[in-house]
């Protein structure tokens, strides 16, 4: 791994894009539509105040849908996972990689302007490859 690569470098390819989030009060079906529309596999979840309160990812939603397809009608806040952790902009590639696990599909980072971005496995793969 490149020791020089920092968390802030990992968002380079999508730093110009607005972070896509699901709202706690949205239906799971609406969140799934967002994921399909933007070709993303994980979503941070925010409350009415804009605070990050949870997360969704395709693996957990897949398992929930297999158990009960009616889950689509539930609210996001009823099925969401814990929020993705934040990393410092200067966190190393190795640090970020260790934080992304089976249970934790992504991490969040705030740039110098205060904008929040998501770092996923795909971002790490792109940095290494």
Regions found by a protein language model. Give the residues of each.
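The conserved cystathionine-beta-synthase
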Residues: 21-39, 46, 65, 86-104, ...
